[in-house]
Design a protein with these regions (language model features):
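Asp-box/WD-like beta-propeller blade repeats and closely related beta-sheet repeat scaffolds
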Residues: 150-242, 247-271, 276-277
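Loop/turn-rich, solvent-exposed surfaces of beta-rich toroidal or solenoidal domains
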Residues: 32, 36-42, 46, 320, ...
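Beta-rich, blade/repeat-based domains predominating
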Residues: 94-103, 158-173, 208-231, 266-270, ...
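Beta-propeller blade signature
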Residues: 127-144, 190-202, 251-297, 391-411, ...
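A short helix->beta-strand "capping" segment at the edge of beta-propeller domains
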Residues: 36-97, 147-156, 205-209, 301-302, ...
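Blade-loop segments of beta-propeller domains
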Residues: 92, 97-100, 107, 116-175
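Conserved beta-strand positions in repeat-built beta-propeller and related beta-rich domains
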Residues: 104, 110-120, 180-187, 232-238, ...
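Blade-level signature of beta-propeller repeat domains, shared across WD40, Kelch, NHL, RCC1
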Residues: 451-487
Length: 487
């Protein structure tokens, strides 16, 4: 009798386990494309074929016309900075760990978003140990002063009680001396977007305007693209956060993606630390990242709508004409949307890349190409990047890859990768019709001058811009500036 009761209790448990195992197997089977395409980049080191150094038009090309040097800033005393000036032993800001760069042809300047304290505070990848230090914004006048160094941008009116961990940013330019800047801020309590007005008299200064915060619209803001002084697109990389925001905000973000009924229960599960890495992996596998369309008024109202969702680690975002481009880091490619179509009829084009893309940027149009291309910088190997973040030494460097993406159905892709040591078509499936991917930069991360784990690239191929090409990284030292890289 007792044996029959025990068997009766065990049998339903076995059935539940079989159902769960079957569901997980079905989920994995449904993601076979993900495993075949992303698995090598996500779980293995960089291929041996990756060159120690390649740049278009550089030493390894037929016409070595490109010269590259790191651009080092001076130390600027700041008691809230993470780094220490070795000459004075005082805390000071320096233009290192600059995750994002933004270029404006009108302003003739490149702005840098730098946070050396990211080694101890990173809400996307961890750790989240110490948010006490502050990052800073820098500017480089690359057109008018070709040999200039990055200069710190003073932030006037920014509240002393606010922490500042700048990540992605965007510019809305008014004229050659005025612009509005939006900066994603990985604050200790919850992520926000800081609105700053830039003005240049003799030097650039930033006036704090306000802070944007919305439980869904700014849940985990990574990259930004402003389309007006009160309107921008925001990529929210993940639903699962290393640093959970306040419960009401977190439940609102969960509800927006997975429904109101599950939100309270999932909040408890997602904040249970022993299972965090499992949920974070499922987040990328299921594609719970999304792009928000955020608007605000001078009166303080912030409104939000989800423009695109089901994006595996939504990252860089740019708008070019009628198209919106989103880097899907977890899907090793770029999604392209028509930004004026309604959500119900919105379709996307997937452009695969030979690396895990990070930030995106538009190239400056030139006489050879009237419409800008899209630059994507990223990581050929996720494990190498993680090891570099943990052990930032010359022996632990991470590879980088930068490519330009554009659409032209009337031209062939046959010569796009001519001369590239490790061409992109060896690492990606067939491109959609009309799309081109051309490698501009490759590195194993162990060649000087160099960057490691590139996150952003900018390119001004015009003579006025001296063919300036910038590459920067998440944790690395000063950005790399290459000159003479013309279209």
């Amino acid at each position: 009798m007792h044996g029959q009761n025990a068997q009766a209790r065990v049998w339903p448990m076995l059935k539940v386990r079989h159902l769960v195992a079957g569901a997980l197997l079905a989920l994995v089977w449904s993601q076979t494309w993900y495993i075949r395409t992303i698995f090598p980049k996500a779980f293995f080191s960089v291929p041996r074929e990756m060159p120690s150094w390649y740049i278009r038009g550089g030493e390894s090309s037929a016409s070595p016309s490109v010269t590259c040097t790191p651009i080092r800033s001076e130390y600027v005393a700041d008691p809230q900075a993470y780094e220490t000036n070795p000459s004075t032993s005082q805390h000071a800001q320096i233009a290192d760990a600059c995750e994002d760069l933004r270029m404006s042809d009108t302003l003739g300047a490149v702005f840098l978003s730098c946070d050396p304290g990211r080694k101890e505070w990173n809400v996307f990848m961890g750790p989240t140990a110490n948010p006490a230090s502050r990052g800073a914004l820098w500017v480089l006048d690359y057109k008018t002063a070709p040999d200039a160094l990055p200069v710190l941008v003073p932030m006037e009116g920014y509240p002393d009680s606010y922490d500042f961990h700048p990540h992605g940013m965007s510019l809305f330019v008014y004229d050659e001396n005025h612009a509005r800047m939006f900066v994603a801020n990985e604050r200790a309590a919850a992520s926000t977007i800081e609105v700053l007005d830039l003005e240049r008299s003799h030097e650039w200064r930033a006036q704090y305007v306000r802070t944007l915060q919305h439980p869904v619209g700014t849940h985990m803001p990574n990259a930004l693209h402003a389309v007006g002084p009160h309107e921008l697109y925001v990529s929210n990389s993940k639903l699962v956060s290393h640093r959970p925001p306040p419960r009401a905000s977190y439940e609102a973000a969960i509800a927006a993606q997975l429904g109101n009924f599950l939100a309270p229960w999932l909040y408890v599960a997602l904040t249970y630390r022993p299972l965090f890495h499992i949920f974070s992996f499922l987040d990328d596998l299921l594609g719970l990242g999304y792009v928000s369309h955020v608007r605000f008024t001078d009166d303080g109202d912030v409104t939000h709508s989800i423009f695109a969702q089901r994006i595996s680690f939504a990252n860089g975002v740019v708008v070019s004409g009628e198209q919106l481009y989103v880097a899907a880091t977890g899907a090793a490619g770029i999604y392209v949307y028509d930004r004026h179509k309604k959500a119900a009829s919105k379709r996307r084009t997937y452009v695969p890349l030979p690396f895990l893309p990070d930030n995106l940027a538009l190239t400056v149009p030139s006489e050879h190409r009237t419409s800008p291309g899209v630059l994507a910088a990223g990581h050929p190997s996720l494990p190498d990047m993680h090891l570099y973040a943990l052990y930032s030494t010359p022996a632990r460097r991470a590879p980088s890859w930068v490519a330009e993406v554009w659409y032209n159905a009337s031209s062939s892709t046959e010569h796009d990768e001519a001369g590239v040591p490790f061409p992109s078509d060896r690492a990606i499936p067939r491109l959609p019709y009309g799309w081109h991917v051309q490698t501009l930069f490759q590195s194993s991360g162990r060649h000087a001058p160099d960057v490691s784990a590139a996150t952003t690239a900018l390119w001004d191929p015009t003579p006025q811009g001296r063919g300036a090409f910038f590459v920067t990284s998440l944790y690395g030292p000063s950005p790399l500036l290459c000159k003479g890289m013309y279209s």
